[in-house]
C-alpha cells in the first residue's frame, strides 16, 4: 500500500503540474494583457470529510470566493456570467446514478465590494449563472464580487470527487477539488461563453488568473495543489498559484511523501 500511495501522489502531482499557465465601486485598470487585468480569486474554504463506510454521506465544501476582475472588452457590462461547473458535475452524476441524489453546488449569496447583495439568476444549464452588477462596468474598469458557496463532493471518478477506497489514481479517502468554485466566464465577440458542460475531454475554458485559497481540512489530511502550499500552526493551508486557467486541489490521508536531492554533474 505504501508503494501504491507514493505512486498515486506522484501521478496527482503530474496532473496538477499539467494545468495550463497562462468612492466608486470600480477602479481604472492597466492596459489589456497586463497582470492587473487578469481575474484574481481569493477563496476561504472548509472541507468536511466524507464517511468511507457510508457512501451516501458525501464530502462537503463550503467557501467564500472573492473575484476581482477587469472589463477587458470594448463593451460596457451591466452583468457578468459565472460558471458553476460543480453544479453541472453533480447534476450529471445524479442522472447516471441510482444512489441517493447529491445536492448540486449552490451559490448562496453574491455581494459587491461594498457588501451590498446582488441579484443573480441560474440558467437552465445549472453551470451558467448571471450576476447583475450594481452599476455598469465600463471598458478598462475593475471591480469585485463576493460569493458564498457550498457543494457536496460525489463519490465517483470525476474532476470533483472523493475516493473512499483508493484506486490506481488516488489513495484511500482522497478528495479531488477541480472546478470546485465559481469562475468568471470568458467574454468573446460581444457575448459570454455558455458552452455546455460534459465529463469527457476539455469542455470548458475561462480567463487565466491568480488564485489564493485558505483551506481548513481534516487534521490528518495532506493537501497539494496547483502552485504552492503552506500549512500554518493552526492547521489551515494557504495555497497559491499565479497566471493559471484552472486551480486544482487534492486532499487526503492516504498519501506518503518522498524527498530527494538532485545533483547535476558537469
PLM feature segments, named:
Residues 60, 98-168:
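A surface-exposed beta-strand-loop module
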Residues 87-96, 223:
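Short aromatic-acidic-glycine turn motif
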Residues 6-24:
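Sec-dependent N-terminal signal peptides of Gram-positive bacterial secreted proteins and lipoproteins
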Residues 22-63:
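N-terminal, polar/Ser/Thr-rich
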Residues 261-266:
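Conserved small/polar residues in nucleotide/adenosyl-binding loops
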Residues 69-73:
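Asparagine-centered strand-capping/turn motif at beta-strand->loop junctions
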Residues 148-250:
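Extended, low-hydrophobicity, Ser/Thr/Pro/Gly-biased non-transmembrane segments
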Residues 77-81:
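Ligand-binding face of N-terminal immunoglobulin V-set domains in extracellular IgSF glycoproteins
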Amino acid at each position: 500500500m505504501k508503494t501504491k500511495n507514493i505512486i498515486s501522489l506522484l501521478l496527482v502531482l503530474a496532473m496538477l503540474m499539467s494545468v495550463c499557465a497562462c468612492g466608486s465601486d470600480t477602479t481604472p485598470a492597466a492596459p489589456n494583457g497586463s497582470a492587473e487585468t487578469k481575474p484574481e480569486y481569493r477563496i476561504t474554504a472548509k472541507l468536511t470529510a466524507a464517511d468511507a463506510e457510508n457512501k451516501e454521506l458525501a464530502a462537503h465544501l463550503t467557501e467564500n470566493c472573492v473575484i476581482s476582475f477587469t472589463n477587458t472588452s470594448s463593451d460596457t457590462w451591466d452583468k457578468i456570467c459565472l460558471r458553476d461547473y460543480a453544479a453541472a458535475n453533480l447534476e450529471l452524476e445524479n442522472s447516471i446514478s441510482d444512489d441517493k441524489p447529491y445536492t448540486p453546488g449552490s451559490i448562496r449569496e453574491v455581494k459587491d465590494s461594498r457588501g451590498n447583495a446582488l441579484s443573480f439568476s441560474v440558467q437552465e444549464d445549472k453551470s451558467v449563472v448571471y450576476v447583475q452588477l450594481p452599476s455598469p462596468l465600463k471598458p478598462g474598469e475593475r471591480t469585485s464580487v463576493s460569493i458564498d458557496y457550498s457543494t457536496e463532493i460525489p463519490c465517483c471518478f470525476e474532476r470533483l470527487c472523493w475516493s473512499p477506497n483508493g484506486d490506481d489514481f488516488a489513495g484511500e479517502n482522497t478528495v479531488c477539488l477541480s472546478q470546485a468554485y465559481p469562475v468568471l466566464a470568458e467574454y468573446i465577440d460581444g457575448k459570454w461563453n455558455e458552452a455546455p458542460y460534459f465529463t469527457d475531454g476539455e469542455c470548458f475554458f475561462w480567463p487565466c488568473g491568480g488564485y489564493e485559497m485558505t483551506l481548513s481540512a481534516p487534521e490528518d489530511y495532506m493537501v497539494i495543489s496547483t502552485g504552492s502550499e503552506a500549512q500554518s500552526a493552526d492547521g489551515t493551508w494557504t495555497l497559491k498559484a499565479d497566471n493559471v486557467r484552472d486551480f486544482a486541489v487534492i486532499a487526503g490521508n492516504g498519501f506518503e511523501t518522498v524527498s530527494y536531492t538532485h545533483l547535476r554533474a558537469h
